[in-house]
Amino acid sequence: MPWSPLAALSWALVLRLLALLWPPGRGEACSCAPAHPQQHFCHSALVIRAKISSEKVVPASKDPADTQKLIRYEIKQIKMFKGFEKAKDIQYVYTPFDSSLCGVKLETNSHKQYLLTGQILSDGKVFIHLCNYIEPWEDLSLVQRESLNHHYHQNCGCQITTCYAVPCTISAPNECLWTDWLLERKLYGYQAQHYVCMKHVDGICSWYRGHLHLRKEYVDIIQP
């Protein structure tokens, strides 16, 4: 594909935006806003299951003045859950080379499969970073795997609010309170692994595990 200013601008803009999140002196850590797996699905342009075949460090663009580097992962796509209208069979995904810009390190040439969520840039390349939801497929719960096919997509009209301390309240009927951090001091706890924020016919959203309503202890603890 010939180099174009628009394509170079896309890469430059993404990398600069990531760099702005980590000003000088903050260190090498990558920080991301918390998001439930359902939110990751709804906010991503592409969601696929894939194996990683190889990796290669490449320039971010063909512009000689651009010194940014990317890791290009060659993948074998197993299944696409979202992004059909923008892409068909994905061969490569790209991530920042620098860990300070949230570059993702994936295992290559192994039997491990990944769930990858990411964005599709204006030049058609798929871009992923640590603030996306990227997990080994074997670590996903049965509810998460099933929800990738239907429930996440069907309930993107629901809003998920992270609860850090009690009391937590919702401000709209289409909100669900995400309490994993409050109860377990980790983001991807029981609620993230086993529940979906689903909308009723009356427009009200609440947590469901398959056909089961959210366990009572989750409801009790968020009451003022």
Swiss-Prot record:
GO terms for cellular component: extracellular region. Residues 30-156 form the NTR domain. The keyword Secreted applies. This is Metalloproteinase inhibitor 4. Gene3D superfamilies: 2.40.50.120, Tissue inhibitor of metalloproteinase-1. Chain B, domain 1. It comes from the Eukaryota. It comes from Mus musculus. Residues 30-33, 99-100 are annotated as: Involved in metalloproteinase-binding. PANTHER family: METALLOPROTEASE INHIBITOR (PTHR11844), METALLOPROTEINASE INHIBITOR 4 (PTHR11844:SF26). The keyword Cell membrane does not apply. Complexes with metalloproteinases (such as collagenases) and irreversibly inactivates them by binding to their catalytic zinc cofactor. Residues 1-29 form the signal peptide. Keywords: Disulfide bond, Metal-binding, Metalloenzyme inhibitor, Metalloprotease inhibitor, Protease inhibitor, Secreted, Signal, Zinc. The record marks 69 as: Involved in metalloproteinase-binding. Zn(2+) binds at residue 30. Belongs to the protease inhibitor I35 (TIMP) family. GO terms for biological process: Notch signaling pathway. One of its GO terms (molecular function) is zinc ion binding.
